Amino acid sequence: MKVLVAVKRVVDYNVKVRVKADNSGVDLANVKMSMNPFCEIAVEEAVRLKEKGVATEIVAVSVGPTAAQEQLRTALALGADRAILVESNDELNSLAVAKLLKAVVDKEQPQLVILGKQAIDSDNNQTGQMLAALTGYAQGTFASKVEVAGDKVNVTREIDGGLQTVALNLPAIVTTDLRLNEPRYASLPNIMKAKKKPLDVVTPDALGVSTASTVKTLKVEAPAARSAGIKVKSVAELVEKLKNEAKVI
């Protein structure tokens, strides 16, 4: 079974982002970038499937600038066999990314595609679903457990009030939730080996995909500043402040 895993380059989750002075977006100058945490979970699940003897090849793919090769090398160090970068410096919306991934899927013909359920920079939670619609593949979103059984993959999903398990006919698309697994760290020997693994670079034009956006970002704003909280000495004082100062009771 060939497994295709999508990964995205995002601002590291430990970084406090800054908005540009003109409110056109986030200032990425000299900012640490990392693999999207949900994508790390997707890579880990693919590697575990290979360790179980279910997957025979793992292909990591990313859409983004040349610098995204860094995240692909990380995926290779974690256990992917080869990588593909769809190189684009444009600001791409979810649909454009899904179209590019669809072109890669058509070329690679994987039996299973695994993506993070969302990226922490935009929180759109759209690409996996759009890719499923474009390919016609079955989809299982918010996966907390994945089991491949013959020509099907059973996906346990976290939903409000409980769990739902669905059986998907392969080929299929799965998006990962936080509780699916705990991603491993790449060892130094594997990091060195990853440098020699194949990484192909293609362009949207070579794939025959237009990345023209139908969405325009008008403004990006930082959250409004919040006043610091205070400590009170008693319940009576708390009630007094809620009643007379906050006026919520």
UniProtKB/Swiss-Prot annotation:
Keywords: Electron transport, FAD, Flavoprotein, Transport. SMART domains: ETF (SM00893). The keyword Flavoprotein applies. Binds 1 FAD per dimer. Its cofactor is FAD; AMP. CDD domains: ETF_beta (cd01714). GO terms for molecular function: electron transfer activity. SUPFAM superfamilies: Adenine nucleotide alpha hydrolases-like. Heterodimer of an alpha and a beta subunit. Belongs to the ETF beta-subunit/FixA family. The electron transfer flavoprotein serves as a specific electron acceptor for other dehydrogenases. It transfers the electrons to the main respiratory chain via ETF-ubiquinone oxidoreductase (ETF dehydrogenase). This is Electron transfer flavoprotein subunit beta. The gene is etfB.
